[in-house]
Amino acid sequence: MGVVSEYMCDRTTGTRHAILIDPADQTPEVAANRALAAAHAGSRMILVGGSTGTDMDNVHATIVAIKESLELVSWAASQDSDAVADSGQIPVVLFPQGAAALSPAADGITFMVLMNSMDQRFLIGEQVEGAPFVKKAGIEPVPMGYLICEPGGKAGQVGNA
């Protein structure tokens, strides 16, 4: 089990909240500000992805901006003896729409199977296509089954669920 998986499964730290930031919805700088706000509000994992309207460059720029902001806040907190310096420990994990939206800067990737998709691309195709990149970049894969219960939304339409 990798660092991100261990972090997710560690019961000693209690309940955690994760926020999903879609790179297509804002600039990387705005995404970084939203991630910082979420971290200050108690989120303990940042998921990046989920959109059909983004590409590898946008995802990468967003993850880099978020990680730089979290590291800067963590460093600043380390200079203040009264502050808690844990923002740099928040993992930034890919929640990709597919193999065309990956980044080597991520701490991990939700390697997911859309379990009720009628399209083999979302059952195994995207995973097979993205696996060489994930391995080469050293990104920790986090296995995940994804089930869409009401296929009226965009994810259900795109994933043919």
PLM features: residue spans?
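N-terminal amphipathic alpha-helix/helix-capping segment at the start of soluble metabolic enzymes
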Residues: 1-21, 126-143
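Glycine-rich, proline-tolerant flexible connector loops at the mouths of alpha/beta enzymes
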Residues: 45-62
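Conserved anion-binding
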Residues: 95-161
